[in-house]
């Protein structure tokens, strides 16, 4: 299959993956309205073309949390990444490091912190959920510190699991899920050999290290579901702010009031996010939520955004709407599934090229020059 655009990797991933894995990363919650709106709302935003601006010198570099990024992009935390390619978290982290952007390791990764951090030569970020098992949270934070993790991404939009109906149809969950997954793997021999066999162990490394025994897919669903904490409030995060002395980012903000609360709490950044449409269907897309949040807290902390970003044009749109940087989730997992580390490297190159074209043709010579003026004000607005 020819890969000429960043969006080509989705079809390539679908060909290679067993359906339960493809639909797990591709799907959203309930009827998936928010999942679709994330992409549609963002792609509908018109960029303002400018010409004859002498764009011979162009820089995508940006500073974020005392790090220099080659472009305002980081790889988002995605659970089970190691099921999409052999030791997938390591491959994705290497690709990000080679490009000069951060990789964020998920709490529920296949590869543990201690395997991923030594594989790269730049600081890594780590994502943590709010869980009832505070002992696990403290253990994960201590291990992240010991591994040299610089930035903590704290996910707060999962006090309860979202209803992901597609998973029951695909075999990720639901009746006879385990035998259905085995049958699907048998019909995808390339994945079964490369990941299913050579990619072992498939337990969730960060959780297994704490529990002292392998935590596989079935255990993961049960353990994580039992540990979500709907009682969580800002005061429950104070011990983490005291324990973690590096940058702390709150992920899952969609409302300006919550963004203001994050400032009061002392967060270093927020991620405007609806969890990729995987939690509450019917909420605002990140693109629609971002401008009001930027108006409320811009300059008081770093604003990142995710959900719906598929191309370099989308990155430019999010920056113009008020983000300082973005997180790529599904986009990099598609590339990883299709072509491993090389696929993620190529994806990031394509994202950069698309950003450069957009910046040249909107007259923005640096990331700092991308603003609301880079967008077309709709008639009647």
UniProtKB/Swiss-Prot annotation:
GO terms for molecular function: FMN binding; L-lactate dehydrogenase activity. Its cofactor is FMN. Keywords: Cell inner membrane, Cell membrane, Flavoprotein, FMN, Membrane, Oxidoreductase. It is found in: Cell inner membrane. The lineage of its organism: Bacteria, Pseudomonadati, Pseudomonadota, Gammaproteobacteria, Pseudomonadales. PANTHER family: L-LACTATE DEHYDROGENASE, S -2-HYDROXY-ACID OXIDASE-RELATED. One of its GO terms (cellular component) is plasma membrane. Residues 1-380 form the FMN hydroxy acid dehydrogenase domain. Its EC number is 1.1.-.-. One of its GO terms (biological process) is lactate metabolic process. The active site is at 275 (proton acceptor). It is a peripheral membrane protein. It catalyses: (S)-lactate + A = pyruvate + AH2. The gene is lldD. It comes from the Bacteria. NCBIfam families: L_lactate_LldD, PRK11197.1. Substrate binds at residues 24, 129, 164, 278. This is L-lactate dehydrogenase. Homotetramer. FMN binds at residues 106, 127, 155, 251, 306-330. Gene3D superfamilies: Aldolase class I (3.20.20.70). It holds the Pfam family FMN_dh. Catalyzes the conversion of L-lactate to pyruvate. Is coupled to the respiratory chain. Belongs to the FMN-dependent alpha-hydroxy acid dehydrogenase family.
């Amino acid at each position: 299959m020819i890969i000429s655009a960043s969006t080509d990797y989705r079809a390539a991933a679908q060909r290679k993956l067993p359906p339960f894995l493809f639909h797990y990363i591709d799907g959203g919650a309930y009827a998936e309205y928010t999942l679709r709106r994330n992409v549609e709302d963002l792609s509908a935003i018109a960029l303002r073309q400018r010409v004859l601006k002498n764009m011979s010198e162009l820089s995508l570099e940006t500073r974020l949390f005392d790090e220099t990024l080659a472009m305002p992009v980081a790889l988002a935390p995605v659970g089970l990444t190691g099921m999409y390619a052999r030791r997938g978290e390591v491959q994705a982290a290497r690709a990000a490091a080679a490009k000069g952007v951060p990789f964020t390791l998920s709490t529920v990764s296949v590869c543990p912190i201690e395997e991923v951090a030594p594989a790269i030569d730049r600081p890594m970020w780590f994502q943590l959920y709010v869980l009832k098992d505070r002992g696990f949270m403290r253990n994960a934070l201590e291990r992240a510190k010991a591994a040299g993790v610089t930035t903590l991404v704290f996910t707060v939009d999962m006090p309860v699991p979202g209803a992901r109906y597609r998973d029951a149809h695909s075999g990720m969950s639901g009746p006879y899920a385990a035998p259905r997954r085995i049958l699907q793997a048998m019909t995808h021999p390339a994945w079964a050999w490369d990941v299913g066999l050579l990619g072992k162990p498939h337990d969730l490394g960060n959780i297994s290290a704490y529990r002292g025994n392998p935590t596989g897919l079935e255990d993961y669903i049960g353990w994580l579901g039992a540990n979500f904490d709907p009682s969580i409030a800002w005061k429950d995060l104070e011990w983490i702010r005291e324990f973690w002395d590096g940058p702390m980012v709150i992920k899952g903000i969609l409302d300006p009031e919550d963004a203001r609360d994050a400032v009061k709490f002392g967060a270093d950044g927020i991620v405007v996010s609806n969890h990729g449409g995987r939690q509450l269907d019917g909420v605002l897309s990140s693109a629609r939520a971002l401008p009001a949040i930027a108006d409320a807290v811009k300059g008081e902390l770093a604003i990142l955004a995710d959900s719906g970003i598929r191309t370099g044009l989308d990155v430019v749109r999010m920056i113009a709407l008020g983000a300082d940087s973005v997180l790529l989730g599904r986009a990099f997992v598609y590339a990883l599934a299709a072509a491993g580390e090389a696929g993620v490297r190529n994806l990031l190159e394509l994202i950069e090229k698309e950003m450069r074209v957009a910046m040249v043709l909107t007259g923005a010579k640096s990331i700092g020059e991308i603003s609301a003026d880079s967008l077309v004000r709709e008639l009647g607005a």
